[in-house]
Swiss-Prot record:
The modification Diphthamide is found at H699. This is Elongation factor 2. It comes from Lachancea kluyveri (strain ATCC 58438 / CBS 3082 / BCRC 21498 / NBRC 1685 / JCM 7257 / NCYC 543 / NRRL Y-12651). Its main location: cytoplasm. It is found in: Cytoplasm. One of its GO terms (cellular component) is cytosol. The gene is EFT2. Gene3D superfamilies: 3.30.230.10, 3.30.70.240, Elongation Factor G (Translational Gtpase), domain 3, P-loop containing nucleotide triphosphate hydrolases, Translation factors. SUPFAM superfamilies: EF-G C-terminal domain-like, P-loop containing nucleoside triphosphate hydrolases, Ribosomal protein S5 domain 2-like, Translation proteins.
């Protein structure tokens, strides 16, 4: 047992070259938390007997009950390497003790915002893949997120015990299934990799892939076996590693290596990987599971495994676990892989700095981040808030990218909307104290230097969810995180007892702090709305709200889906609107924006903050826009960054720039609440064709222009074939063959469209992918389990907005029904106003 003290960890924090910040990411139920256990156990925090069952990083009660991870949890581990291994590390190191900051993240797609928060503060990722199920939809999503943050992956193929015990595969089959998994991971990596990272594909022969079983607590990399055999055969370890994977065969008669499958007589040879790596494992499994009492001691002696007194009495799975743990301890393989192949903060920040920092790449803050310099000004990014045991207070959880954070230090707390040189969204306050996050516990420390992950007390009142802490006055913010999911499911929350209202408001504030991807706001009709990414996410949020954050009984409305309003054609005539004092007129037309441009805006490829000339170049080259139009984009809306645009197509209008601010403000308002049923607009482009303004400045103030622009936008919108869009989930369902029929019948009832259906080679499992409207997804999981006898497991992730083909203005159609119901709920008049209501005659 390595019992270590906080002082030891603190002293290691200064050796930046010996730190590894990494997160564990994977598809749901591929065994992240279970695998993390074996690492935690090595650090001496939980006993060996519990490892694999304790799921130490699942700290919440509901996480233990449901058996899923909901929040990402951080823990620091201490590890030592032999001098021989340290020599093989490709980057600078000092000494042979290492500090590993590990974050166990959720795999369930509803919580992928937690994964984003975890990835931002780490430099490497351990991607866990299930041998039997292979690479799934969520594996791809999290890998894509990681590579987008320039994070280097290593892979662990987990649940090998399932392949051996449940499926009883042969050695060659297992090799093929490993090879397939490796290949599909590399395909994803090469698709999304960033040139700056270099080649980050994973190769078993280089030791960047481990194979093992988290439940049984064993794992190996090819390097470990190469170590054993290179001593025995007297060969160089590097050469041995290359031979233990791929098409290389060893001929025991001639004692020669070949890359042909047969020897000279045409007899088939056994693949080196099967012979040297899998064979001992298969033999142990068969001897122990078939209770061959006489073979076991011989095998153990050969493999140099010593059992203690009472361990000799065990049999079956219990014995198997102990033997495999002694033969190939999981922690050794994983720690070796993490330390040798993942970058230290010094290495990583060098290439991640430009992507993390919003300002220019030559200002002092960016240079300090690049060098990971503990003596520079402080730059710290808070990626999420963690609730403390004391109700209502939070630790700010983040990473020091430069400088050193000390208890009691005065810092500038910059929220996400802070602009250098202004005073908005900025507080200057002292950090009360710094703590080290250890799963369920925290340990106070005095200070924390660059490259480490830390929790801060006393900052929570000044930040909503994320932000930058710095001591350098000219510092820009660290870039805001891009979430791959968006909150599309909403419910209205009311209190049962009117006296509890203030508690609800306070609780909603705390809820929106504690979860990076939940939205809380108040609607026009005075309801409190909570929006989440899916059914499960919402359920957990509301349960937290009721039990922890507000602590009062609540009434919750049935879930409602967020829609978008859009147009399909160009306005059939020019929309004209006059100001209230009849002295100003705005003429405009609305038209649709191509889906790919909307997606590019939503993904941040076309950015409102970019230089307008560069942006116009991109839009002209990649999306076929007219350059003059692209240069004259006045604003994005709603919220200044949505997928709707105002383009100035006027010619020689006097005083035009004076009304620009008013027009922008009006468009933000109009695009946030569309004319059909008060939902946000999407993919609408408004071209201002002409403006007539009064010569006297007093008659063309905001009060005249804003309502005019809004009315004109609505009129143009309603003249351009308005439609509504509904959000659509991509569902991936894994199931055995006999359950496929049940899936189709449920999908048909729910307006789902099947996209693909394929069988995983070497397994009886089928993977069905389908599009399912979010509106129909409530209770989908339950119905699916009923129809398939509990054999199908759906994973739903928001995929795209789909336009409903029917006319939303006609109450008899499907779209019209949705509109009427929503207008009733919002307390508006039931029929949608016609364009005439917003259009003014000359």
């Amino acid at each position: 047992m390595v019992a270590f003290t906080v002082d030891q960890i603190r002293s290691l924090m200064d050796k930046v070259t010996n730190i590894r910040n990494m997160s564990v990411i994977a598809h749901v139920d591929h065994g992240k938390s279970t695998l993390t256990d074996s690492l935690v156990q090595r650090a001496g925090i939980i006993s060996a007997a519990k490892a694999g069952e304790a799921r130490f990083t699942d700290t919440r009660k509901d996480e233990q009950e449901r058996g899923i991870t909901i929040k990402s949890t951080a823990i620091s581990l201490f590890s030592e390497m032999s001098d021989d291994d340290v020599k093989d590390i490709k980057q600078k190191t000092e000494g042979n003790s290492f500090l590993i900051n590990l974050i166990d993240s959720p795999g369930h797609v509803d919580f992928s915002s937690e994964v984003t928060a975890a990835l931002r503060v780490t430099d490497g990722a351990l991607v866990v893949v299930d041998t039997v199920e292979g690479v799934c939809v969520q594996t791809e999503t999290v890998l894509r997120q990681a590579l987008g943050e320039r994070i280097k992956p290593v892979v662990c193929v987990n649940k090998v015990d399932r392949a051996l015990l449940e499926l009883q595969v042969s050695k060659e089959d297992l090799y093929q299934s490993f090879a397939r998994t490796v290949e599909s991971v590399n395909v994803i990596i090469s698709t999304y990799a960033d040139e700056v990272l270099g080649d980050v594909q994973v190769y078993p022969s280089k030791g960047t892939i481990a194979f093992g079983s988290g439940l049984h607590g064993w794992a190996f990399t090819i390097r470990q076996f190469a170590n054993r055999y290179s001593k025995k055969f007297g060969v160089d370890r590097e050469k041995m590693m290359e031979r233990l994977w791929g098409d290389s065969y060893f001929n025991p008669k001639t004692k020669k290596w070949t890359n042909k499958e047969t020897d000279t007589d045409g007899k088939p040879l056994e693949r080196a990987f099967n012979m040297f790596v899998l064979d001992p494992i298969f033999r142990l499994f068969s001897a122990i599971m078939n209770f061959k009492k006489d073979e076991i001691p011989v095998l153990l002696e050969k493999l140099e495994i010593n059992l203690k007194g009472e361990e000799k009495e065990l049999e079956g799975k219990a014995l198997l676990k102990i033997v495999m743990r002694k033969f190939l301890p999981a922690a050794d393989a994983l720690l070796e892989m993490i330390i040798m192949h993942l970058p230290s903060p010094v290495t990583a920040q060098n290439y991640r700095a430009e992507q993390l920092y919003e300002g220019p790449s030559d200002d002092p803050a960016c240079i300090a981040i690049k060098n990971c310099d503990p003596k520079a000004d402080l730059m710290l990014y808070v990626s999420k808030m963690v609730p403390t045991s004391d109700k209502g207070r939070f630790y700010a959880f983040g990473r020091v990218f430069a400088g050193t954070v000390k208890s009691g230090q005065k810092v500038r707390i910059q929220g996400p909307n802070y602009i250098p040189g202004k005073k908005d969204d900025l507080f200057i306050k002292a950090v009360q104290r710094a703590v080290l996050m250890m799963g369920r516990f925290v340990e106070p420390i005095d200070d924390c230097p660059a490259g480490n992950i830390v929790g801060l007390v006393g900052v929570d009142q000044f930040l909503l969810k994320t932000g930058t802490l710095t001591t350098f006055e000219g510092a820009h913010n660290m870039k805001v995180m891009k979430f791959s999911v968006s909150p599309v499911v909403q419910v209205a929350v009311e209190v049962k007892n009117a006296n509890d209202l203030p508690k609800l408001v306070e609780g909603l504030k705390r809820l929106s702090k504690s979860d990076p991807c939940v939205l809380t706001y108040m609607s026009e009709s005075g309801e409190h709305i909570v929006a989440g990414t899916g059914e499960l996410h919402l359920e957990i949020c509301l349960q937290d709200l009721e039990n922890d954050h507000a602590g009062i009984p609540l009434k919750i409305s049935p879930p409602v889906v967020a829609y978008r309003e859009t147009v399909e054609g160009e306005s059939s005539q020019v929309a004209l609107s006059k100001s209230p004092n009849k002295h100003n007129r705005i003429y405009l037309k609305a038209e649709p924006i191509d889906e790919e441009v909307s997606l590019a805006i939503e993904a941040g490829k076309i950015n409102p903050r970019d230089d307008f000339k560069a942006r116009a170049r991109v839009m002209a080259d990649d999306f076929g826009w007219d350059v003059t139009d692209a240069r004259k984009i006045w604003c994005f809306g709603p919220d200044g960054n949505g997928p709707n645009l105002v383009v100035d197509q006027t010619k020689a209008v006097q005083y035009l720039n004076e009304i620009k601010d008013s027009v922008v403000a009006a468009f933000q308002w109009a695009s946030k609440e569309g004319p059909i049923f008060g939902e946000q607009m999407r993919s609408v482009r408004v071209n201002i064709l002409d403006v007539t303004l009064h010569a006297d400045a007093i008659h063309r103030g905001g009060g005249q222009i804003i309502p005019t622009m809004r009315r004109a936008t609505y009129a143009g919108f309603l003249l351009a074939e308005p439609k509504i869009q509904e959000p659509v989930f991509l569902v991936e369902i894994q199931c055995p063959e006999q359950a496929v029929g049940g899936i189709y019948s449920v999908l048909n009832r729910k307006r789902g469209q099947v996209v693909s259906e394929e069988q995983r080679p070497g397994t009886p499992l089928f993977t069905v992918k389908a599009y399912l409207p979010v509106n129909e997804s409530f209770g989908f999981t339950g119905e699916l389990r009923q129809a398939t006898g509990g054999q199908a497991f759906p994973q739903m992730v928001f995929d795209h907005w789909a336009t409903l083909g029917t006319d939303p203005l006609d109450p008899t159609t499907k779209a019209g029904e949705i509109v009427t119901a929503a207008r009733k709920r919002h307390g508006m008049k039931e029929e949608v106003p016609g364009w005439q209501e917003y259009y003014d005659k000359l």
